[in-house]
């Protein structure tokens, strides 16, 4: 009798488990996994402060990341133990957006700001008139920063800070270098080839700045773009490039007004314009000032640029030849949310908008775009998760692709290249 009762109980428990199906990627599932951001109940970064918005591979073999939310936190992933270790709360900051850079001596520089992933509150009632919506939208965007002193640049030394244990609420061991652009967030950072100068762009005013690392001093270099455009898909966002890249000659590149690539030339102290226009939608038939911006941008050793756009395209550019080539887009939806250059010659990307599930893709010129699918991990009965939103990627020393989830209670995902997309692309075990 007891045996029958046990069997019946097991059947009741097993039935819903068998009915639930996790969505797996379009490759062998053991190539995808995730880790918590610390030890639950002890060091784990709080759920409302966990969305990952910056990742950076370090020369020490580890990968550093930062979060955005009620408070901003620093963390490190160590491949030797395959774990994430929180490194403390970054002062009183709310966010870090694409602004982690390794400098001289392995010091990590961190650009901070307000949360740039939260939904902005818009004015419901507004006066009528020419371009009234655009005018009010800019007022609403600026209102968020009206009482904000400005994002800081901090320095963190892994040699001094990595060995400590940071319980929940502990402060990160960072040194404050100051505020580069008052009333603005630091929106992106890069570093010069000689590793002596940081360059950054601010949001929402799109002002370029530099930081002399040795002198710990900032210079405001001027507006990167003058035009106010709201290309979307987020309709509460001013189109400001989310990445900068330094080529070997020291020039700083990104997209500017009207989607044209431009550079800051430090040797001359001036901006250089080009005719290289990034791919995307330009709304030529409408009385609307809209153009795409760079999402991610990487400079190769030969000076070639490879980047992505807010409309979801991948492109390469040869600045010395004033030549840009579009490689299309892997997904109908707009935005490349994150990207990183893999050790296998591929550009790995996360594509998708905020109201849908992001997917992992890769691009290489000899094979085009490959669809690796949704980032779903099923290790049931131990743990499982289908993640929707991502905003940061990095490539570890061994080639592992680290992907930062940017939802509440976020996890750090890891994808191990080397496998193949399944025949027919779609994983046949997924529900359809």
For each predicted feature, which ranges?
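Structural motif
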Residues: 71-75, 118-124, 148-152, 206-210, ...
């Amino acid at each position: 009798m007891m045996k029958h009762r046990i069997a019946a109980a097991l059947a009741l428990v097993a039935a819903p488990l068998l009915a639930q199906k996790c969505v797996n990627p379009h490759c062998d599932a053991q190539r995808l996994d995730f880790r918590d951001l610390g030890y639950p109940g002890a060091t784990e970064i709080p759920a409302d402060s966990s969305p990952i918005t910056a990742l950076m591979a370090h020369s020490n073999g580890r990968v550093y990341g930062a979060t955005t939310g009620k408070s901003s936190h620093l963390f490190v992933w160590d491949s030797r133990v395959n774990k994430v270790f929180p490194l403390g709360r970054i002062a009183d900051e709310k966010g870090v957006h694409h602004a982690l850079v390794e400098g001289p001596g392995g010091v990590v520089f961190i650009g901070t700001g307000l949360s740039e992933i939260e939904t902005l509150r818009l004015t419901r009632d507004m006066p009528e008139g020419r371009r009234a919506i655009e005018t009010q939208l800019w007022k609403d965007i600026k209102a968020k920063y009206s009482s904000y002193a400005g994002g800081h640049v901090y320095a963190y030394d892994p040699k001094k800070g990595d060995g400590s244990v940071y319980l929940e609420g502990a402060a990160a061991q960072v040194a404050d270098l100051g505020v580069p652009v008052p009333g603005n967030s630091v929106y992106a950072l890069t570093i010069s080839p000689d590793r002596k100068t940081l360059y950054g762009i601010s949001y929402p005013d799109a002002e370029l700045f530099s930081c002399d690392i040795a002198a710990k001093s900032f210079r405001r270099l001027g507006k990167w773009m003058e035009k106010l455009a709201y290309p979307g898909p987020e309709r509460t966002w001013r189109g400001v490039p989310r990445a900068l890249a330094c080529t070997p000659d020291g020039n700083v590149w990104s997209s500017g007004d009207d989607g044209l690539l431009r550079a800051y030339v430090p040797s001359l102290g001036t901006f250089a314009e080009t005719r290289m226009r990034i791919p995307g939608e330009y709304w030529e038939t409408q009385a609307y000032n809209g153009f795409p911006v760079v999402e991610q941008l990487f400079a190769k050793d030969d000076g070639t640029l490879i980047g992505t756009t807010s409309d979801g395209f991948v492109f390469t550019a040869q600045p010395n030849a004033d030549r840009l080539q579009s490689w299309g887009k892997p997904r109908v939806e707009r935005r490349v949310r994150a990207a990183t250059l893999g050790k296998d010659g591929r550009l790995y990307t996360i594509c998708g908008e905020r109201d849908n599930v992001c997917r992992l893709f890769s691009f290489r010129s000899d094979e085009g775009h490959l669809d690796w699918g949704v980032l779903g991990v099923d290790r049931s009965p131990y743990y499982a998760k289908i993640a929707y939103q991502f905003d940061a990627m990095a490539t570890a020393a061994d080639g592992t692709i680290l992907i930062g989830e940017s939802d509440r209670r976020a996890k750090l995902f890891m994808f191990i290249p080397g496998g193949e997309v399944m025949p027919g692309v779609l994983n046949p075990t997924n529900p359809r």
